[in-house]
A protein has these predicted regions:
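Structural motif
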Residues: 76-78
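Extended, small/polar residue-biased N-terminal targeting/export presequences
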Residues: 1-58, 106-108, 112-122, 133
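Ca2+-coordinating acidic residues in Ca2+-binding motifs
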Residues: 4, 91-94
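Conserved catalytic-core segment of clan PA serine endopeptidases
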Residues: 63-64
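Cleft-lining beta-strand/loop regions that shape enzyme active-site pockets
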Residues: 58-60, 69-74, 83-86, 93-215
Length: 215
């Protein structure tokens, strides 16, 4: 297939750079990535992470009330196979396209879990997943805690809802936790920064031609 050959050629070129941050996406992989950053997609409802050296794929976080949680997936689980695909032999962005799919369809996953001698075999029914990218709670001494798991389209709105809720509870200071946040939309980041920083230039992007965009 000519399209497959072309995709393989470009993937090989990017892998040859030896730069883990330079990746070629097929049309399907790009659409999957954009769906995840939109905040809504059809899949299982889990955040995945891949070790750049071993290629091992792990469950970083399972969202509440999702197919992944209902099937029994847990944070820290290791994905061994998706259907008949060895997870560690595929780039994460491509593997995700096999995990997501139409509502009501199922995906079979083989899971390794610490403390379990045998692999777990799970059939998970895909459903609509609305990603909660912000969680919050009030700590002692009127300290608010806000964790942002990724920067998607609804993140700024969710962030301000958390801020206002904590203010209503008497928040006097705040901790913003970005640990394990893989990134996302730059505009989502700058919208949040506009909410909490004084007016002025926060960040800018500039391409090789000198075209600059201020935020």
């Amino acid at each position: 297939d000519k399209a497959d050959l072309t995709d393989g050629l470009y993937k090989g070129l990017f892998e040859g750079l030896g730069d883990s941050y330079s990746v070629y996406y097929t049309k399907e992989e790009y659409e999957s990535m954009m769906a995840s950053t939109s905040g809504t997609y059809f899949g299982i409802g889990a955040v995945l992470s891949q070790d750049v050296k071993t290629m091992q794929v792990s469950i970083l976080h399972v969202y509440e009330n999702t197919p992944a949680e209902k099937a029994g997936l847990k944070d820290g689980d290791v994905i061994v196979k998706v259907e008949d695909i060895n997870a560690a032999e595929m780039e994460l962005s491509e593997l995700v396209t096999h995990i997501r799919g139409d509502k009501g369809t199922t995906v079979h996953m083989q899971i390794a879990r610490e403390g379990e001698a045998d692999y777990l075999e799970l059939d998970i029914e895909r459903d609509k997943v609305e990603v909660p990218t912000v969680t919050s709670e009030m700590l002692d001494n009127h300290i608010g805690y806000i964790a942002i798991t990724e920067f998607a389209e609804p993140t700024e709105e969710q962030f301000m809802q958390a801020v206002n809720s904590l203010k209503d509870q008497g928040m006097e200071s705040v901790i913003i936790d970005l640990r394990d946040n893989p990134g996302g939309y730059l505009t989502a980041v700058t919208e949040i920064l506009d909410d909490i920083l004084p007016e002025g230039l926060t960040v800018y992007t500039e391409d090789k031609y000198g075209n600059r965009q201020n935020y």
